[in-house]
Amino acid sequence: MTRYLLSKLGQAIVTIVLVVLVVFTLLRFMPTAGYFSKEQYKTMTDAEKTAYLRNMGVLDPMPVQLQKFVSGLFHGDLGRSITLYPNMPISNVLGEKIQYSLLLNFISWFTAAIIGMPLGVAMAKNKSGLVDGLGTLYVVLIRSIPSIIIHFFIQVFLSKWFNLPMLFYMDQPISWLLPIVSMSIGSIAGYATWLRRYIVDEENKDYIKFATVKGLPKAFIMWRHIFRNAIVPIAINIPSDFLLMLSGSLVIESLYAIPGTGGLLIKSITAMDNPLVQVLVLLYGALSVLGVFLRDIVVSFVDPRIKLVASNN
C-alpha cells in the first residue's frame, strides 16, 4: 500500500512541476501590456515602460525569472495584481474570495450528498415503484431543463413565494438559502442517478445471488456488500469535487452577486492582468492534480482490489 501511494505521490509532484513550467513559459508570451495599469500604459513613454519592465524583472533571462518565481511561491509571495485589483497582493485577493466560494460550495456539496445518496438508495430498493418513479421524474426534469432557467426560476419565484432575499449577503444567513439550493439541486440528481445505477448493477451480480441463496439477511447484503461496492465509484470523486469548490461557480455567483472566485480567471484574462492570470492558472492546475492524487488515496482505502494488488506486490 505504501509503495502504491508513494508512486502516486511521485506522479503528482512531477505533474505539478510540469504545470509550473508550462504556465510560467506560456505567460511570458502574453502581451507586456498586462504588467501595466491602464493609466500607466497610456501615460508612460516607451523608455519608461522598458525601465518599468526591467525593474519588475520581466526582461531578465528566463532561468532567472523562473528562479525568482519559484522562490516566491515557496515563500508565499504570489505577486501583486496590476490591472484588476491595482497593487493588491494576489494572496489577499484569493483569500477574500475563496472564503465565499468554499463556504457556499461546501454546504451545497454536503446538502447534495445527504439528500442525493439516500434518494438513490431508496430508488434502487423500490425499483419501478413510486419512489423510483418520482425520483426518476425529478432527475429527468433537472437534466432536461437548461440549468440557467432552473437557477432563474429558483431566484425569482422561490424568493417571492417564501419571502427570501434574491441576492447574497454574508451577514444574512437566510440569503444563503437560494444559492445553496441552486448549487445543490443538480448534484442531488447526479448522486441519486449514479448510486441507483451502481446498486442495481451490483444486485445483478453472481455473488449477490449466491449470498441471497445462502439465506443472508437482505439488510446485511445491501449494506455489507451492495452499498459498499456501489459507493466506491462515487467516493473516489469526492476529493476532486471538493477541491473544485475553490474555483467557484461563474453563473450562480454572478446571479446572486456572490463575491467569490467564480469567473475570476476570465476577468483577469479580460483585464490582461498577467500576474493574476499566472497564479490562477497555476492554482487551478495544482488543484486538479491534487484532486487526482486524493482520489487515488481514497481508492486505495475503499477499493479492496487495490489492497489486494498492493499486498501481492
Segment roles from a protein language model:
Residues 58-115:
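An internal, D/E-rich "acidic patch" concept
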Residues 2-7, 11, 119-154:
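Cytoplasmic-entry segments and transmembrane alpha-helices of multi-pass inner-membrane transporters
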Residues 19, 110-112, 116, 179-187, ...:
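Hydrophobic alpha-helical transmembrane segments of polytopic membrane proteins
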Residues 39-41, 244-287, 291, 307, ...:
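Glycine-rich helix-loop "coupling/hinge" segments at transmembrane-helix boundaries
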Residues 16-67, 163-172:
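Hydrophobic alpha-helical transmembrane segments of membrane transport/permease proteins
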Residues 134-189, 266, 274:
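Generic hydrophobic transmembrane alpha-helix motif, especially the helices
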Residues 9-17, 21, 91-122, 227-228, ...:
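Transmembrane alpha-helix signature in integral membrane proteins
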